Amino acid sequence: MANLERTFIAIKPDGVQRGLVGEIIKRFEQKGFRLVAMKFLRASEEHLKQHYIDLKDRPFFPGLVKYMNSGPVVAMVWEGLNVVKTGRVMLGETNPADSKPGTIRGDFCIQVGRNIIHGSDSVESAEKEIGLWFKPEELIDYKSCAHDWVYE
């Protein structure tokens, strides 16, 4: 079997406030991915600026940081085969108007500025984001009893 990879998923303040945390976790679990780490926190502006550093020159950057700092987020690390790519498909397009029904954004979002969830866009950015949000000892290594029922 190919190597399992990890991705960073964050439920944004609007997803938390709308009570969608359980539904989002459920979808990742039902897909067969394994939760490796999770924390509930209100990220500082400095932390968010570091997370979104690649967007710092975009006109929407200050509003994005303010929005992400407006309430608590749920930061998670998920593990599985092709979890980065599959996770992005599960999330839907960044703009919910372009997202298909059945995706998280297609089912729960209307506007791009309130798209409820973030997911790493590559294995490299996942590694960077996981390192920014979690200490190594916060990543829990265990074998799920469902592993052999999900993977050949």
Swiss-Prot record:
CDD domains xrefs: NDPk_I
Active site positions: 118 (pros-phosphohistidine intermediate)
Annotated spans, Interaction with AKAP13: 1-66
Top-rank taxon, per record: Eukaryota
Modified how: The N-terminus is blocked.
GO function terms (MF aspect): ATP binding; DNA binding; enzyme binding; fatty acid binding; G-quadruplex DNA binding; GDP binding; heterocyclic compound binding; identical protein binding
A Pfam family reported for this protein in Swiss-Prot or TrEMBL: NDK
Residues reported to bind ATP: 12, 60, 88, 94, 105, 115
InterPro entries: NDK-like_dom (IPR034907), NDK-like_dom_sf (IPR036850), Nucleoside_diP_kinase (IPR001564), Nucleoside_diP_kinase_AS (IPR023005)
Enzyme Commission code: 2.7.4.6, 2.7.13.3
Assembly and oligomerization: Hexamer of two different chains: A and B (A6, A5B, A4B2, A3B3, A2B4, AB5, B6). Interacts with CAPN8. Interacts with AKAP13. Interacts with ITGB1BP1 (via C-terminal domain region). Interacts with BCL2L10.
Protein family per UniProt: Belongs to the NDK family.
Protein name: Nucleoside diphosphate kinase B
Species this protein is from: Rattus norvegicus
Gene this chain is encoded by: Nme2
